[in-house]
């Protein structure tokens, strides 16, 4: 196993811990854990969480401008899921021109903090991913294994 910086855990310890977490997901009677994992772990949700973490409280359109490729419909759905799961807070401003802004909740901020090591790991290992893809593509050229 490659050195991950977690010297106190053996491979078996990591596997046992991973199994415990997976068992917790499996034992989720009402499906909330799995649903939150699916919502919070998808491309657009992570983008919203990152955007609100970096820029703070924003309007819907401002979030959309900072997230390349997201449609208005997908952004609306994503914000609703994140709000329902308690990761994002919606602020309604009843002014002369009413508007809505979104911000990370404390739980959303905690998710952002926990995602940074994964994003860092991905950035640090991008050359390994590229090399693996090149090797795989070379071996499987023209659909042949």
What are the functions of these language-model segments?
Residues 83-103:
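Beta-hairpin "wing" of winged helix-turn-helix
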Residues 65, 77, 117-120:
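Generic recognition of well-ordered alpha-helical segments
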Residues 4-20, 27, 106-109, 113-145:
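Amphipathic alpha-helical dimerization/coiled-coil segments
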Residues 47, 51, 87, 107, ...:
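Solvent-exposed, amphipathic alpha-helical segments
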Residues 22-74, 101:
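N-terminal helix-turn-helix DNA-binding core of bacterial DNA-binding proteins
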Residues 75, 79-85:
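Basic amphipathic alpha-helical segments that dock to polyanions
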């Amino acid at each position: 196993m490659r050195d991950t910086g977690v010297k106190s855990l053996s491979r078996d310890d990591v596997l046992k811990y991973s199994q415990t977490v997976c068992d917790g997901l499996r034992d989720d009677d009402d499906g909330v854990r799995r649903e939150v994992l699916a919502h919070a772990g998808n491309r657009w949700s992570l983008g919203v969480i990152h955007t609100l973490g970096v820029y703070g409280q924003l309007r819907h359109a401002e979030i959309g401008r900072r997230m390349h490729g997201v449609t208005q419909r997908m952004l609306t759905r994503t914000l609703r899921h994140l709000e329902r799961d308690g990761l994002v807070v919606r602020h309604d401003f009843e002014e002369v021109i009413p508007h809505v802004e979104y911000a990370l909740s404390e739980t959303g901020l905690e998710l952002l903090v926990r995602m940074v090591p994964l994003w860092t790991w991905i950035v640090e290992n991008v050359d390994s991913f590229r090399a693996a893809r090149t090797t795989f593509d070379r071996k499987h050229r023209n659909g042949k294994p």
